[in-house]
């Protein structure tokens, strides 16, 4: 089902096309802001990755030469490796979104943002941040969002919301604020000796704008959002943590870790690890794996 949603954002129209492209992705949004166009997709594997104790999230921001009307010249016509800006943009997308996924979720998730057209007045980095949140929110991937991102610049002492590339590069402030409906969850900033009061004012301003974007995303989720899929929980049972605390007390752990000598600290941790492995060795072969438990719904909050 093809649908288009739009809202006014900093004097321009933000438009989101859903259902036009990337139909096989769990969630996809074709973002338009001015003449800048970014395709954001969210995909997840069907099964959790085994043997890991972290959430395998991958974020990509792909800058294409054709988006600015150029074709690579010379013998090699292929695109080069990701630029420093692309890597840093992917990290800024990752930081606010990663904590909003369930802690016991181990399915591989990829957020891909492909820049298709660039308008110097509308930075594609912002569209990628918003597009990733929208694509994930409307998908069936468990996610405790939505979240929204706003960038604030400062030119001649005045705030500029979602500034152009020139104002972003030459202004006195480069502030990126990501928020949920409840609080600010990420701040990244660079400034040219502005007052602390001005910085706080800019953060509050960005957070206020984020609330309008979140309301916009929630409206999309209510209309076209998919039901979040069931997944295999990879959380360690609380009973196991309690048993571990009986074998190694918090005081023992603090004494082992809080030492200035790295070699001593590593030896202490190795000894504690061996002690726990020996205590739980029999359970590894006689008890069912905690990963056999299945969660039917995602948590209600992050």
Predicted feature residues:
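Conserved small/polar residues in nucleotide/adenosyl-binding loops
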Residues: 285-294
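Mobile "lid/hinge" segments at catalytic clefts and subdomain interfaces of large enzymes
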Residues: 142-250
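N-terminal leader/propeptide and maturation segments of large enzyme subunits in energy/redox metabolism
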Residues: 239-284
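Hydrophobic alpha-helical segments, chiefly the membrane-spanning helices
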Residues: 296-302
């Amino acid at each position: 089902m093809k649908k288009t949603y739009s809202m006014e954002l900093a004097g321009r129209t933000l438009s989101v096309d859903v259902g036009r492209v990337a139909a096989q992705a769990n969630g996809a949004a074709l973002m338009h802001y001015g003449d800048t166009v970014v395709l954001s997709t969210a995909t997840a594997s069907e099964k959790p990755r085994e043997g890991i104790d972290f959430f395998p999230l991958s974020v990509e921001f792909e800058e294409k030469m054709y988006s600015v009307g150029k074709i690579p010249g010379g013998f090699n016509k292929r695109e080069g490796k990701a630029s420093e800006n692309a890597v840093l943009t992917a990290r800024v997308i990752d930081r606010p979104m990663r904590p909003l996924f369930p802690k016991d979720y181990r399915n591989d998730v990829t957020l891909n943002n492909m820049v298709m057209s660039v308008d110097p007045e509308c930075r594609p980095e912002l569209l990628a941040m918003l597009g990733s949140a929208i694509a994930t929110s409307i998908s069936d991937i468990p996610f405790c969002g939505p979240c929204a991102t706003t960038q604030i610049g400062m030119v001649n002492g005045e705030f500029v919301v979602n500034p152009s590339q020139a104002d972003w590069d030459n202004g006195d402030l480069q502030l990126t604020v990501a928020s949920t409906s409840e609080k600010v969850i990420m701040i990244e900033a660079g400034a040219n000796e502005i007052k602390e009061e001005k910085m706080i004012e800019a953060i509050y301003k960005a957070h206020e704008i984020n609330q309008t974007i979140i309301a916009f995303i929630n409206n999309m989720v209510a209309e076209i959002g998919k039901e979040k899929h069931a997944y295999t929980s990879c959380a360690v049972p609380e009973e196991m943590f309690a048993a571990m605390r009986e074998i190694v007390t918090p005081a023992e752990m603090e004494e082992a870790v809080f030492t200035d000598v790295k070699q001593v600290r590593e030896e202490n941790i190795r000894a504690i690890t061996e002690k726990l492995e020996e205590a739980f060795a029999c359970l590894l072969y006689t008890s069912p794996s905690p990963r056999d438990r299945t969660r039917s719904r995602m948590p209600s909050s992050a």
